[in-house]
């Protein structure tokens, strides 16, 4: 059993690491913070307690695809947007349709995307999605020519604030979803 004072110290270490990290931290990342071996169950318990500690505050501890992070609660986003009045990037219909096909039907080839959309996929669309780190090549189809198979990345899931593809909104709502730049 962990002593109460020790629990507070451990939570403080987790809190400062999560608050100062630019990226979500995985369980493995957080386990490396401590010199003594810690069980994953203990770490999860500490994270649950930390989440409860922040329950009535302006920020919340959330789990996304690549780990855990602190973020502002949704009700404060309107105020924070005033600090950075930059407009959100508008993505073309072709970009959004291509991303939708990849997200919901992965793994897919460019040929699959072209067949579904009924038009050729502009290489710039694929490049834009890869530069944004929303899609990546995840393999090759075992057919002549071995075309690349595309799938979404953890960064894509993180930007949507979800942990897995099963949490994606219904397909018909996807293109209306606001995706942060």
Identify the meaning behind each predicted range:
Residues 1-5, 9-10, 94, 155-181:
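Phosphate-centric recognition/catalysis
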Residues 1-13, 70-96, 131, 178:
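Short alpha-helical segments that sit at the start of domains
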Residues 17-26, 38, 104-109:
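Short capping segments at the starts of secondary-structure elements
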Residues 24-33, 107-117:
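Short acidic, hydrophobic short linear motifs in intrinsically disordered regions
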Residues 38-47, 117-134, 144-147:
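Short amphipathic alpha-helical interaction segments
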Residues 51-62, 132-142:
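A short, conserved structural fragment
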Residues 64-83, 139-162:
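Short, cationic-aromatic polyanion-contact patches
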Residues 87-114:
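Glycine-rich active-site/cofactor-binding loop and its immediate structural neighborhood
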């Amino acid at each position: 059993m962990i002593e109460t004072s020790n629990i507070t110290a451990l939570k403080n270490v987790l809190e400062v690491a999560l608050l100062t990290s630019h990226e979500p931290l995985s369980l493995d990342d957080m386990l490396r913070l401590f010199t003594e071996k810690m069980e994953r169950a203990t770490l999860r318990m500490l994270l649950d307690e930390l989440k409860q500690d922040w329950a009535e505050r302006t920020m919340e501890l959330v789990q996304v695809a690549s780990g855990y992070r602190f973020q502002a609660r949704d009700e404060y986003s309107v105020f924070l947007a005033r600090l950075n009045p930059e407009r959100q990037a508008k993505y073309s219909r072709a970009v959004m349709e291509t991303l939708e096909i990849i997200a919901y039907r992965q793994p897919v080839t460019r040929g699959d995307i072209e067949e579904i959309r009924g038009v050729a996929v502009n290489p710039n669309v694929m490049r834009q999605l890869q530069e944004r780190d929303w899609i990546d090549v995840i393999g090759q189809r075992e057919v002549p020519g071995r075309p690349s198979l595309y799938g979404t990345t953890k960064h894509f899931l993180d930007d949507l604030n979800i942990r897995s593809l099963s949490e994606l909104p219904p397909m018909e709502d996807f293109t209306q979803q606001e995706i942060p730049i």
